[in-house]
Amino acid sequence: MKLLTHYKGKEYYYTDNMLYVKTGDGAQFQKLALFDRHFYKLRVFNKIPILEIDGLRMQLVRDFKTPLDYPKEVVRTLGIKKGESVLDTCTGLGYIAIEAEKCGAKITTCELSPAVLTLAKWNPWSDHLFSSPNIESLQSDIAHLIKGMKDKIFDVIIHDPPRFSHAPDLYSQSFYRELFRVLKGRGRLFHYVGSVGESRGRSLASESSRRLASTGFKDIKENKRLQGVFARK
């Protein structure tokens, strides 16, 4: 077991497959893991915590030095500017929301799972998600929440959902219509789709691109490195 960091009076240690916290002198090591219909845990990749659900990694780390490099590249490619409003549909550990906020943007981010938010609150690298006045963190189902949002209120949408088999509704054309509706004119979208199915000849990026196009999105471009699709309203 190795020491990762000290943060706010707590000590964080890690092994190859688990992150632990020690809350004070004489305290026992506590696994940062819990079960809520699925098994959620934090582990470490290149000195940065990542989230796993049922053994599936939720951060894209392939071709990136650390889990923080992927959100940096997404935000940089979107060209997020000071004062813009950003919707982050699936919070996770909040790394994308935090990176977008660094640009001076106002962020609304939504997470379905209370378990994920509980682990994020234990994660020192997620602390800014809950402490920044420029990030509104909501625990809700974005598929329902978005229906109550006003038209044309976001400059940028970052849609980084779980894989298709876990949340097919977040890849549906009806949901894409809601994304289109709440996005301002000429607003930008990034939609992570992953690489599942490619070995069988299926391309979720191509399928999603066609649905986005039929919804009205333009300038649709697949990005293999980020395993997603960029588009504009």
Language-model features: locations:
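A short glycine-rich, Lys/Arg-flanked "PGG" loop and its adjoining helix->strand segment in the class I
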Residues: 171-185
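Conserved class I S-adenosyl-L-methionine
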Residues: 81-92, 108
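N-terminal auxiliary segments of SAM/dcSAM-dependent transferases
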Residues: 1-44
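Class I S-adenosyl-L-methionine
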Residues: 196-233
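Conserved alpha-helix/loop element of class I SAM-dependent methyltransferases that forms part
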Residues: 65-83
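Conserved beta-strand signature within the Rossmann-like core of class I S-adenosyl-L-methionine
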Residues: 186-194
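S-adenosyl-L-methionine
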Residues: 110-150
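Conserved SAM-binding loop of SAM-dependent methyltransferases across substrates and taxa
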Residues: 93-105
